[in-house]
Each structure stands twice: as C-alpha cells, then as structure tokens.
Curated annotation (Swiss-Prot):
GO molecular function annotation: identical protein binding; protein homodimerization activity
Transmembrane segments: none
Listed name of the protein: Muskelin
Residue ranges of every copy of the LisH domain listed in the record: 172-204
Annotated domain remarks: The LisH domain contains a nuclear targeting signal. The LisH domain mediates head to tail dimerization.
Reported tissue expression: Detected in brain, especially in hippocampus and cerebellum (at protein level).
CTLH domain ranges (all copies): 206-258
Effect of loss of the gene: No visible phenotype. Hippocampus slices from mutant mice show minor differences in the amplitude of miniature inhibitory postsynaptic currents, and somewhat slower decay times.
N-acetylalanine modifications at: A2
C-alpha cells in the first residue's frame, strides 16, 4: 500500500498468460494453439476454422482471473483473404455467462492491431477468466476465418483483482436481489417485498422514487405525484434523459435588414468557395472572398446576429494591404486576440507561374481593421506550398495554427520527375503565431504505419480545445473518396485511428463522396457534419440530399438526425426550399458553440443546366432536444390521462369536466398525434365497468397494474443511478 499522502501508482498493465480452452473447429494443421506464437513470416502459423458457418469461435482460459484491458492481433506479413474483417470478443468468469467486450474489425495489412476491451461497469473494473473470440466476416468473401496470433494484456495482480472479483460477485448478487424486489412490488407481493428488503438491506431505488411509488401507485395521490415530478425537473434530474434524446433540426432562413438606397449591395452576393469564421463573443460572422461563377472575389463582410445586418468591411481587401481576390482558401479566428488568419487559394492553370504560385499568408486585426502580410511565401519559411481545399484550425490557448492537406498547385510546364503529373498533397503543419515559425509535423504518407497520415482535399478538420486534439475525417485523394477518421493529439504528437474506414457500417456513418462541412462543440463533446452535394458530376443527380450527422466523441458513435431525399423533394420542391437549404457544395458552415447555432451561406447548387449559378441564401440551424418545460408538461399529461381513465370508471360526469379542463391544458394541441389521442380519450366515458374489471376483486389489481405501468414510464425520465434495474425477472427464464 502507498504511504499516507503518497500519490497512488496506477496498476501495471502486463501480458496475461492463457491457454486454449475450447474451439468450434479447425482445419488441417492450422491448430488453435498456433495463435500462442507470433510468426508473421510463416503462413501456416495460424488457427483456421473448418468453415465460415457460424458460430465459429476460440475460447481462451487465463492462468488466473484478471482485468483484461487490451487484446492484440498479430498478422501474416502480407495481406490475406482469411484475416478477420469483423469479429466480436466476449469475456466472463465462466464460459456460460459472458459479456460483450468488443465489436470491431482488423485492417487487411501486416501491422499488429491492439484494441481496448470493456473492463469497467459503473467505473468499477471487473475481472474475466475466459475470453471468447467470435469471427463474423473474413476479408475474402466465403473464406474460412484465420487468426495468426493473440496477445491479452491487463492486470492480474491478486491484490487488485481480488477486490474487483469480490465487488463483481457482490454486484451480481445485488442486481439479482433488486430484480426480485422489482418483481415482488410490480405484482403487489407486499410481504415478500418487505421481508426481502429488511433481510438484505438493499435499496431498490432512490428514496425519492420510493416516495413517488407510495403516492402514485399505493395512494393514488396524483397531485402529490405532479409536485414531485415538478421538483425533479427543477432540480435537473431529467437532464441526463434530455442529453440522450435525438436532436431535431430547425432551419430558419435569415433575411437580413437592408439599408435604404443601398439596393443589393448591402449584403454579400452569390458565391461558392468563400470562407467564413464566427466570433462567438460578439456574435459576428465574417465572410471573405469566393467565386461568383465568373471571377474570384476580394470583398470582406461582417454579419451581426444581434443587429441582423451585414456590414461591408471592404469591397477589395487587396487595396487595403490585404489578400487578393481568391476562392478555395481557408480562414481561422483567434477569438482571444480578435485576429483572423487566411492561407491558400485556387489558381487557374492559365495564370500559374513561379510568382503567382507563392503562398501568401495574412492576418486581419478586428479592432484596428488592418491587414498584415505575415509571409509572401510560406513554403520559403518552412511552411506549406500554395494549396487549395485544405483545412486550418486555431488553438487560441497555445497561440498555434494547424493546417493539413490540400492539393499543392504546380506550374504546368515544369517536369521535375515522373511524379510531376500526379497530384501532390500537403502534409500537417503547425504555425507558432508568437514566433511566426512553421513546423512540419507529418508528411503526406500512403504507408499504413500507426503514426502515418494520408493527405487529402475537401476533408474536415476540427480542433477540440478541451482535449487538445485535431479530428480529421473524409475527403478525397485523386479519384478515391476516403472514409477514415483519426485524431491527432497536438501536445503528445500522437495519431489515434478512430475508424480506418474499412468497416461496412453502411447507413451508420456519413457517406463518402459528398461535400461535408463539420463543426465541433467541445463542451458537449460532439462533432456535427452537414453532408450535401457531390462535386463529382456523375454522382450528383442520382440522389441529391442533405443529411445532418452527429458524432458523440465519448461514446464513439454516429447518429443521423436528419435526411431529406430527392423523392420527397420532387413533390414539395417549392415549399421545401423555403423550409431548408437545398443540397449544395462549395458552401460554408460555421458554429456558435456558446449559443448553439449554425450559420450557412451560399455555395454551388450543382445545376448542370446553369453551371455558373451560385447561391447567396443565408440560414441558421438550431438542433433542438425536448426542453425541461416540454417534459414537465408531458409527464403531467401522462398523469392526468391516467387519472381521467380512473375517474371515467367511477364518475363519468366528473371525468368529463376533468377531461375538458385539467387534462385539456396539458395537451400540445400543435402535435397532431397528441391531439388525436386526446380526442379518442372521450370514448373511455362510454365503456362499461366490465371493460375495466374482471371477476372478484381484480378491479383493485387492474388499478394497481395500470398505476405501476405509469410509474415505470415516469421512472424512465430519471437518471439510471436512481432507478430500479431495467430488466425484468421473468425475462431470465429461457424456454
């Protein structure tokens, strides 16, 4: 044990010895025990299943119980059709009762891969004695499964594992007792419930919920139940439930105030390939440059959210010592120092020469309204060459800028080597704003090493100011659309592959090949992605749609909160255009993380009939979840609906008055479904008593059962830490 006051040392993670315990099958000499030895250059050193017909598995038995934190798969030195494209890993203290620890897949390459296994319940580590690996899909369709080498690592120190084992045994027993308590109470077995609770001293739930059960189910005191729900809402107890609900998008077209006599010149015109940033402190959107269909633009605008008005800062920034007209450049804002940086641009091949291909780099100071040229040519200063369709992020805290990817512009005539005709892409650079120095962090690499990253264009890159990581995904490299997703820790210089893009989670991740615009909310740990039109003409018309995705960084999961399809658009094209922006590319999207609002401007609608057409529409997007007020009203509606149904059996006249007054005011009459349900409630007044009650005294049982059902519904809004277990005792009975 550590001495008093000493810092606790994290337990050491080490290799865990195991033996092969059971297997589904094996073929020829490809024995299960081959996975104990790592021989990447020996093609026969592997386990291979006899068929790919499920279930195929290997069960490993650890030398002693351990906290199994990681699993590592070794591979053959070349790609192989039998490698596991999809697999699952289960673990437990006995082979009959296992928990899923991992669902993933291997890349079809020669590099070892390590995965973190689930090893905690409620932040408490739990031990395993058995590990079961279940192959689901091989890289070659209809090929048998092969595993070359498996390594398990974790903690097997008995001083650490034994307390975890004790906790796990106690946890399982406690949950079993809680399931019994829940079952007894649901069926009104009062004596059994009280006896078990008294004997075990185990609480079924938080005392507040026990109080609610007493008032609602036992006493039928509906007013007291409403008061209790109101207190819970005001105390923030429904916040966890709200955070788990899906967002609903709400688009609003912004019609800015116009200044008299200014005509159309008091707001930015139609364009694509422009850039926007937002100052969240002053709620100001800045827009610079772009392409209007015939020429590059050099105008610079500010939109005040509070004033709902655009102001033209400059008609031509070049005349004010600023950047020349440009498109496909990038901007980022330092909100602390109130400065905007811009880098890169696209140049038509006809105007490219050694002078024009210099990569200039500018900074705009918001307070003094002045531009400063930081560099005439960033490549000469150790930074990137002239690029377009790259990405740039600001780290205000450390006063650093990160730029990644983009295609390097080259002169047409120059032929340095055979690679000159192939497109070249820029790597990952860091710019120290204080020292005004560049540093190359990663070169463009097509290798599959753990720290290598592949450059691209049209990708998304975001900086998480709290965990200090860059997140990069999507984009295009020559004709290939990339679907990988990785993070880069700017402080430790480490790349972490979140998804290599090989898994076929079709429909569960944003589609490749479509223009994606992304924003990040460090407070909510969310990445937002608006997916629009493809730049590829062939892909454009087949299924034009917008979709909005959210990536939960903590849960490592994507969810699609909104899609609009071509089919629905054909019928409603006019009204739909007024409700939401049409699909597009070359547009810009910025996010105000303080006020939780997105702003979108312009872009290219990709109309083949009018290729020069650009847009100048301006939209805001709010992602809405149920509010506290909505949930309070909804809970009151559920309680009063049940109260009405009870009244209808006893006193129909009193019930009718209750329906018209008390229940009516809790209904959302703008919701067609809720309105219809409310209207159908009146039919309860005409049901005979026999519709509600059976023989003998079962009318009491019916009321108790109905109230219990309402209680279980209301409990769902409370945090899991307060509620009874989710499962039911009867569900454990298998046929």
């Amino acid at each position: 044990m550590a001495a008093g006051g000493a810092v606790a040392v994290a337990p050491e993670c080490r290799l865990l010895p195991y033996a092969l315990h059971k297997w589904s099958s094996f073929s020829s000499t490809y024995l299960p025990e081959n996975i104990l030895v790592d021989k990447p250059n020996d093609q026969s050193s592997r386990w291979s299943s006899e068929s790919n017909y499920p279930p195929q598995y290997l069960i490993l038995k650890l030398e002693r119980p351990a906290i199994v934190q990681n699993i590592t798969f070794g591979k053959y030195e070349k790609t192989h059709v039998c490698n596991l494209k999809k697999f699952k890993v289960f673990g437990g203290m006995n082979e009959e009762n296992m928990t899923e620890l991992l669902s993933s897949g291997l890349k079809n390459d020669y590099n070892k891969e390590t995965f973190t296994l689930k090893h905690k319940i409620d932040e408490q580590m739990f031990p395993c004695r058995f590990i079961k690996i279940v192959p689901l899909l091989s890289w070659g369709p209809s090929f048998n499964f092969s595993i070359w080498y498996v390594e398990l690592s974790g903690i097997d120190d008995p001083d650490i594992v034994q307390p975890c084992l004790n906790w796990y045994s106690k946890y399982r027993e406690q949950e079993a007792i809680r399931l019994c308590l829940k079952h007894f109470r649901q069926h009104n077995y009062t004596e059994a419930f009280e006896s078990l609770q008294k004997k075990t001293k185990i609480a079924l739930e938080h005392p507040m919920l026990t109080d609610m059960h007493d008032k609602l189910v036992l006493k039928g005191d509906f007013d007291a139940c409403e008061e209790l729900i109101e207190k819970a809402v005001n105390d923030g107890l429904f916040n966890q439930y709200i955070s788990q609900q899906e967002y609903k998008p709400r688009w609003s077209q912004i019609i800015p105030k116009s200044t008299k006599g200014d005509g159309e010149d008091n707001r930015p015109g139609m364009r694509g390939g422009h850039q926007m940033v937002i100052d969240v402190q002053t709620e100001t959107v800045y827009l610079f440059g772009g392409w209007d269909g015939t020429q590059d633009l050099a105008d610079f605008w500010a939109y005040s959210v509070k004033e709902n008005q655009w102001t033209c800062i400059s008609r031509d920034t070049e005349k004010e010592n600023g950047p020349s007209a440009r498109s496909c450049h990038k901007m980022c804002i330092d909100i602390q120092r109130r400065q905007i940086y811009t880098l890169g641009r696209y140049l038509d091949s006809s105007v490219r020469n050694s002078k024009s291909l210099k990569s200039d780099f500018y900074r705009y100071d918001i307070d003094t309204n002045t531009w400063m040229l930081l560099s005439e040519d960033t490549a000469a200063d150790g930074g990137p060459k002239l690029v377009f369709d790259h990405q740039m992020c600001m780290d205000s805290e450390k006063h650093m800028i990160y730029t990644f990817g983009g295609r390097i512009l080259t002169c047409n005539g120059s032929v340095d080597d055979s690679r000159a005709s192939e497109p070249q892409f820029s790597g990952l650079f860091a710019f120290n704003c204080q020292c005004q120095t560049w540093k190359l962090l990663r070169e463009d690499s097509c290798n599959a090493g753990p720290e290598d990253i592949q450059s691209r264009i049209g990708h998304c890159m975001l900086f998480h100011s709290k965990n200090r990581c860059l997140y990069v995904f999507g984009g295009q490299r020559s004709k290939t659309y990339l679907n990988d997703f990785f993070s880069y820790d700017v402080d430790s210089d480490h790349v972490d592959i979140i998804s290599d893009g090989t898994k076929k989670d079709s429909g569960m991740v944003p589609m490749t090949g479509f223009t994606q615009r992304a924003t990040i909310d460090p407070e909510l740990n969310e990445i937002h992605v608006l997916s629009g039109l493809s730049k590829d003409k062939e892909k454009r018309e087949e299924n034009v749609r917008n979709s909005f995705w959210i990536y939960d960084i903590v849960r490592n999961s994507w969810s699609c909160v909104y899609k609009n399809d071509q089919a629905t658009k054909d019928n409603l094209s006019k009204s739909l255009q007024e409700e939401e922006p049409c699909p597009r590319f070359a547009h810009q999207l910025v996010y105000d993380e303080l006020h939780k609002v997105h702003y979108l401007f312009g872009g290219n609608p990709g109309k083949s009939c009018s290729p020069k057409m650009r847009l100048d529409d301006f939209w805001s997007l709010k992602l809405c979840r149920p509010s506290k007020d909505y949930l309070l009203r909804h809970c009151k509606y559920l309680i009063r609906k049940h109260r009405f149904e009870e009244k209808a059996q006893m006193d129909p006249l009193s019930a009718l008055k209750y329906l018209q007054n008390d229940l009516y005011i809790t209904v959302d009459h703008s919701d067609p479904e809720e309105t219809k349900e409310f209207q159908l409630l009146a039919s309860a007044l005409f049901k005979s008593g026999s519709d509600f009650t059976a023989l003998g005294f079962s009318d009491v049982d019916h009321t108790y059962a109905q109230r219990t059902q309402l209680f279980d519904t209301l409990v769902n809004f409370f945090p899991d830490s307060m509620t009874p277990p989710k499962g039911n005792l009867v569900d454990l009975i298998t046929l």
